[in-house]
Amino acid sequence: KIARVIPDLPEYKGVIAISFTNKASDELKRRCKQRCADTKQSFFGTIDKFYISQIIIPFSSHVTGNITEYEIVDNIDESSKYALLLEEPFSSKKESILVEGLQEGKIFLKYTGETALYILENVPGAMQYIKARYSHIIIDEYQDCGEIQDKVFIKLVVEWINRNCCGRYKSSNIWFYKTIPKISDCSDEKR
C-alpha cells in the first residue's frame, strides 16, 4: 500500500507508517525502500516514537510557553508529585500534571498518547503540520491499538484526508471503522 502511494507524492510529503515494534517498523521501511527508493518525508516507527518526534517535542512549547530539552520518563516514582498519573482513570487533573511535566522537560512514556492528543486538541498548528507534511496514515495491526491510540486516530480521521488501518477484519475496531467512509481497511490486502 505504502509503495503505491509514495511515488505520486510531492517531495515535501510522505506517509505515516506506524508499527507496534521497532523491528516491524524497520522491516516495513526496508520493504518500502526496495519497492520505491525514495520514501520522501515519510515516517516509519512506533506510535510512541510518532507522538514524541512529530507532535510532542515540536509543539509542546505552544502549550508550555517555553522551549526546553526533554527527557523521556519511563517510570513514575509513587512518591513524586507525578504519582497521580498512576491512578485510573485519566482525568483533567492528570492532563494538567502532564502539562506541568512538559514545562519541566518531562515526557512520560506511558502517557505519550494522552499528551499528543492534548496537543492536537489545543494547538491548531500541530494538526496543520501533520496535514501539510503527510498524505496518509497507515497503522499496521490496528486491532492491537489501545483506547488512547484509537482516540488519536479518530482525531486524525475527522480532520485529515487519507488513512488505512491494517489488521484482522473481525477485530472490533476494524469492524467499527468499516462504517466510516474516510477509513479503508487493508486487512485483506497482501502486504
Question: For the regions a protein language model found, what residue spans apply to each?
Answer:
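P-loop NTPase Walker
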Residues: 1-60
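Short, well-ordered alpha-helical packing segments
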Residues: 2-3, 29, 33, 117, ...
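Conserved catalytic network of the ASCE P-loop NTPase/AAA+ motor domain
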Residues: 7-10, 37, 128-130, 156-159, ...
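Hydrophobic "anchor" residues on beta-strands that sit immediately upstream
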Residues: 42, 136-137, 164
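Active-site flanking residues adjacent to catalytic metal/cofactor-binding acidic residues
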Residues: 45, 139, 167-169
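Catalytic P-loop NTPase motifs of RecA-like helicase/translocase cores
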Residues: 50-51, 142-148, 172-174
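Conserved RecA-like helicase ATPase core segment
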Residues: 152-191
